[in-house]
A protein has these predicted regions:
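Glycine-rich ATP phosphate-binding loop
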Residues: 1-7
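Activation-segment/catalytic-loop signature of the eukaryotic protein kinase fold
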Residues: 41
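Activation segment signature within eukaryotic-like protein kinase domains
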Residues: 78-79
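Protein kinase catalytic-loop region centered on the HRD/HxD motif
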Residues: 84-94
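C-terminal lobe helix-coil module of Hanks-type protein kinase domains
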Residues: 140-239
Length: 279
């Protein structure tokens, strides 16, 4: 077991204390093998703390550092387990809001567990006048959905966006956009194909991820089950069939290589023509 207490550095921060209490409350009500288990504390406790199970294993971030090139099958296994945990929250009308590799643990038996429930938004809590409910985006910028960065309330669609960003990063080691999708830069952002970083990945998988990290919530998958289905099987409705210019299909670094080769070949051709003229 692990006993978790509030940090003494934030004892005077009402929002922090509210989030701590929120985590304890949520943790005791969610029942899923893929969310860290909270244990009911004694009724006569004299200080503020919560008790959770001890999960021996790395965070997903640490696992990613040790496994920079996982197979698509390994990625699907991890994402599916996280999705089961998210589904348990969503069925209780809760949204995690801060899903990221640092908030996921992998137990020694391979079981994946979501942790850090302090930012979980519960439907109706915003009606209560508490500091926690007045906070803006509680998620980490690189994984937070664009609508949350704009100040909108997080929804299950926001969690699905964060999950898809994690899937993208597992497959490529990169994020789908060059910068976090803040309102000031959203119009200039372009989705980066997973094939730019790993050409061996299939087109249909790229199409799945492109839809799941759309900057518009209404364009994303409406459910976790549909996302998981397309993450494991080609969806003909998504696979791009329209013609795209060659300049859009070839990664920028390949164009640099082509330019260098072309320059060398042109130089060789000029030299051969000059040599023939001399003869």
């Amino acid at each position: 077991m692990i006993i978790k207490t509030p940090s003494p550095n934030f004892v005077d921060d009402p929002a922090y204390i509210d989030r701590f209490l929120n985590e304890c409350w949520v943790g005791r009500r969610v029942n899923s093998p893929h969310i860290v288990r909270f244990i009911e504390p004694p009724q006569n406790r004299r200080c503020l703390y919560c008790v959770t199970e001890y999960v021996q294993g790395p965070t997903l971030r640490e696992w990613m550092n040790d496994n920079p090139l996982p197979t698509p099958a390994d990625v699907r296994n991890l994402i599916q387990q996280i999705a089961i945990g998210l589904r348990a929250l969503h069925r209780l009308e809760m949204v995690h809001q801060d899903l990221k590799p640092e908030n996921v643990l992998i137990a020694r038996d391979g079981t994946v567990k979501i942790i850090d429930l302090g930012a979980v938004r519960i439907r109706g809590i915003e009606e209560i006048d508490v500091p926690w409910g007045q906070d803006g985006c509680l998620g980490t910028e690189s994984y937070a959905a664009p609508e949350c960065l704009e100040g909108d309330r997080a929804t299950p669609a926001s969690d699905r966006y964060s999950l898809a960003v994690i899937a993208y990063e597992l497959l490529t080691g990169q994020l789908p956009y060059a910068k976090p999708p803040r309102p000031s830069v959203r119009r200039r952002l372009r989705y980066r194909s997973i094939r730019e970083f790993n050409p061996d990945l299939p087109v249909w998988l790229d199409a799945c991820l492109q839809r799941s990290v759309s900057l518009r919530p209404e364009s994303r998958y409406p459910s976790l089950s549909e996302f998981l289905r397309d993450l494991g099987h080609p969806n003909p409705a998504l696979t791009p069939t329209e013609w795209r210019p060659l300049v859009d299909r070839v990664p920028p670094e390949n164009w640099r290589f082509i330019a260098v080769v072309s320059l060398v070949l042109n130089g060789l051709l000029i030299w051969l023509v000059w040599m023939n003229g001399v003869d």
